[in-house]
Amino acid sequence: MSRPSTKDIDLLVPNEDEHGYLVNILQQLGYKSASGWGWSREDGFIFDLFRGNSIHTTQLLESSLKEENHTLVKEFSRVYLGVLNYYDIIISKLFRGTNVDNEDCLFLLKAKRSEINLATLEKRFRETASYDVSEGAVMKNLEHFLRLAQKEVI
């Protein structure tokens, strides 16, 4: 499964003040609002900055700041860069349910199969979905993904 890489990066900034500070820095660097969350400049690269505990419309069950909910990538003098746990990455993508998001989730599942328990994923997804206004629709996304995973990964 090979496809061109996108030129964007999704960042979750849990602290509202830090989110505002980061937006200000991007504006100083010439970035302009490109969408509800996106900031871009003429090179086409987009930063999607999500505030608080939500990615797009997905409200995470727990704070990404909790140690078990992220992995440190790099710590700079004023920036802590971490990546969400695999479950929250997959859940936030499956809530959108696009083909590209499904491909991303399958790729992650294949690459990290020994670290991702499908029963845990399903339980966590169902709990997250129970708080969403479109619970039925997102549950269909999960069912579709599990069928794909059964065919392609398991």
Identify what each model region corresponds to:
Residues M1-I154:
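Compositionally biased terminal segments of proteins
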